[in-house]
């Protein structure tokens, strides 16, 4: 433990642990050499330095982009070419969007904000009002490390803890920056894949199944039974989850990228330096409506504007035109991301289906069609709910985006699988575009529901009668039903593993009286897929659903196999003599475990503090939306963890300590605790037998399947943890 103390403190005093506490509200960027406050209330920019580029002047082509004068100290993006930022203006307003450098700003202007609003909107009304929350004035989390920065300023009120120079807080507050978006995606959501060709669906679901089978075979080969049981339990849980979420294997080089506008590109091009110049790629945005929202673009990495704005090697961004963004269900340039998939090139084995844009979506703008007459609410009720006016009609601002988006996404999926016409799909997609923007842009989504005839579409594509003759509407295909909520009797305790590997729960029938005086039976939430033994019971019978049902059932079967294997796996007998022989290793593991376990009460304390903070904020604002509560919870938990010093300490197991474990010097209970606090992948490598150079049949099948899907030799080798030469041998039939 490193103890900070004032000059003159005697050495013995640092062992007075009752008076040693975690550093509160401060964070270190250099391993404890110096500390800064974890969050400073943002500095504010004078609005005289800000100009607005309105719709009429081309702002609509870059809506959401913040252009910053290069070389201005208090507006530096650091090492990043682009970042999603918040900048406070005049102490009461703020702008948010994607910030990039610009070299052609007017004299006296350091920031230009691009908007789709017309010139009739006053400058300050284009900006957003800050929240009445000193911990979160933007209503959005700032990056914990690197979100705020300082610059040298002789008149500054802060002091650099290393150099002693006076500093000021930068105006830029980063929510995310270059490098934060580009994680490789390991899955393909059913929302996209279920609307593609049946051959692609089967291929990617088959790959996902092969991946899981190979993982199961590897776990079964592990030599340490306690490690084996730990991994089997985790594997079974993962398979159960996979059956519900229906995620297929990713396509080669599939990657998420943030989008930025480039006005000099053609509408058939994309600036994407992470991909090969000249190849074609598909862009998919979520939530995904259908193949009519997928642009297939040619990579043009020679574009001069792209090089100037994004650089030659952007970590995770692509440049597109506004027309392409509009096709992506009206994507904005304020931090929206797309999934990029190389495909449809001459030599590509990946073929993505893309169809022409729906005529009913042409020139449709959600804000023009359903936006309020004024950005100011006409009233705010006692619970803080905002009401707006449109064409003389007053409506409440949406506060349940996720729920409404789930409903319309399920409807679009069901309509697609059941063969809806293009005009019908256009109605549903228009409404989905309104729903996704409704909360952010204060749109009248209920009027959109009426105008687009959503009720009649639900009746036609989701209406059904049960065995008792009762009419129901809701998710109507396996794809939409899998994650649909269902209520089950309240369950108590841990589930029991049945002889076939399935789980059974102890159900408790509890009755209670609701606020209306009615007697109810207490239930808990589950999903329809989790509660059925056969996924086909959720299918309406389409070929796409059959492919997904086969996959889901294979995941359920693997989960059951894993649990049967777990029950039949023994344990290493505890050996007192081994404990004596490896005495120092046992002591070392005990010390490491004790250190790791010390975090548990701190984490509980952090959770308690965070819950109290969020409860207080909810009391001040009873009508907080789910999204606002989630943001507040994340921020409160981060601050509470810093406050109490809660941080997970991973146990690093040495070679000698592993020998002690294998010899039985550690009891099974203690080893289980150690495994719960270490890097399980490293342990898996230690426990995997090295006696054979042959790879399993399931891995051989994966090599063939990945090759058929277009993965390169090196990509297959990385995915399977083997050498490229081994991959080549098996592909050439030499093994």
Model-derived regions: residue spans:
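A short beta-strand element within the Helicase C-terminal
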Residues: 336-340
């Amino acid at each position: 433990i490193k103890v900070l103390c004032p000059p003159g403190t005697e050495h013995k005093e640092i062992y007075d642990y009752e008076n040693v506490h975690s550093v509160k509200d401060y964070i270190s960027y250099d391993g404890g050499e110096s500390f800064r406050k974890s969050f400073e209330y943002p500095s504010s920019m004078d609005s005289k330095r800000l100009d607005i580029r309105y719709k009429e002047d081309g702002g609509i082509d870059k809506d959401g982009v913040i252009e910053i004068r290069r070389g201005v100290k208090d507006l530096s993006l650091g090492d990043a070419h682009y970042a999603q930022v918040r900048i406070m203006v005049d102490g009461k307003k703020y702008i948010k969007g994607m910030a990039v450098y610009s070299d052609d700003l007017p004299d006296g202007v350091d920031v230009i904000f691009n908007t789709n609003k017309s010139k009739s909107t006053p400058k300050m009304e284009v900006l957003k009002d800050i929240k009445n929350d000193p911990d979160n004035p933007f209503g959005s989390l700032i990056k914990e490390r690197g979100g705020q920065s300082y610059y040298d300023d002789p008149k500054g009120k802060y002091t650099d803890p290393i150099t002693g120079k006076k500093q000021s807080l930068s105006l830029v507050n980063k929510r995310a920056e270059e490098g934060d978006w580009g994680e490789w995606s390991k899955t393909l959501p059913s929302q996209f894949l279920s609307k593609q060709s049946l051959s692609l669906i089967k291929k990617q679901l088959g790959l996902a199944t092969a991946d899981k089978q190979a993982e199961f075979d590897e776990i079964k080969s592990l030599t340490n039974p306690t490690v084996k049981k730990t991994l089997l339990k985790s594997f079974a849980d993962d398979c159960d989850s996979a059956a519900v979420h229906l995620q297929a294997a990713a396509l080669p080089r599939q990657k998420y990228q943030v989008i930025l506008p480039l006005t000099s590109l053609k509408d058939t091009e994309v600036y994407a330096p992470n991909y090969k110049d000249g190849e074609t790629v598909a862009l998919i945005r979520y939530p995904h409506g259908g193949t009519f929202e997928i642009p297939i673009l040619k990579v043009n990495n020679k574009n001069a504007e792209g090089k100037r704005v994004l650089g030659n090697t952007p970590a995770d961004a692509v440049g597109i035109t506004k027309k392409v963004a509009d096709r992506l269900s009206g994507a904005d340039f304020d931090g929206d991301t797309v999934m990029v998939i190389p495909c449809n090139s001459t030599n590509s084995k990946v073929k993505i289906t893309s169809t022409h844009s729906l005529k009913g979506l042409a020139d449709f703008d959600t804000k023009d069609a359903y936006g309020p007459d004024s950005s100011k609410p006409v009233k705010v009720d006692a619970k803080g709910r905002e009401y707006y006016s449109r064409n003389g009609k007053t409506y409440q601002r949406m506060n349940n985006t996720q729920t409404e988006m789930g409903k319309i996404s399920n409807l679009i999926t069901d309509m697609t699988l059941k063969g809806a016409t293009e005009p019908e799909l256009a109605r549903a997609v228009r409404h989905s575009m309104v729903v996704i923007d409704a909360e952010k842009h204060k749109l009248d989504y209920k009027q959109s529901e009426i105008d687009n005839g959503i009720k009649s579409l639900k009746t036609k594509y989701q209406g059904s009668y049960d065995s008792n003759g009762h009419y129901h509407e809701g998710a109507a295909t396996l794809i939409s039903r899998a994650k649909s909520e269902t209520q089950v009797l309240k369950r108590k305790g841990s589930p029991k593993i049945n002889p076939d590997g399935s789980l059974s729960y102890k159900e408790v029938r509890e009755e209670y009286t609701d606020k209306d005086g009615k007697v109810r039976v207490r239930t808990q939430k589950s999903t329809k897929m989790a509660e059925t033994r056969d996924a086909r019971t959720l299918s309406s019978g389409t070929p796409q659903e059959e492919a997904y049902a086969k996959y889901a059932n294979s995941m359920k079967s693997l989960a059951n196999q894993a649990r049967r294997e777990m029950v039949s796996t023994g344990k290493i007998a505890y050996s007192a003599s081994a404990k004596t022989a490896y005495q120092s290793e046992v002591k070392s593991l005990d010390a490491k475990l004790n250190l790791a376990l010390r975090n548990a009460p701190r984490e509980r304390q952090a959770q308690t503090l965070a819950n109290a903070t969020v409860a207080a904020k909810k009391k001040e604002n009873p009508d907080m939306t789910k999204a606002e509560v989630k943001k507040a919870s994340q921020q409160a938990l981060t601050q509470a963890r810093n406050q109490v010093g809660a941080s997970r300490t991973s146990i690093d197991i040495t070679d000698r300590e592993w020998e002690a474990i294998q010899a039985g010097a550690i009891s099974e209970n203690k080893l289980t605790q150690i495994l719960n606090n270490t890097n399980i992948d490293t342990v898996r490598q230690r426990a995997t037998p090295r006696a054979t150079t042959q790879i399993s049949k399931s891995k051989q099948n994966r090599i063939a399947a990945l090759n058929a899907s277009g993965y390169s030799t090196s990509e297959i080798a990385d995915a399977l943890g083997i050498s490229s030469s081994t991959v080549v041998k098996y592909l050439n039939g030499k093994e």
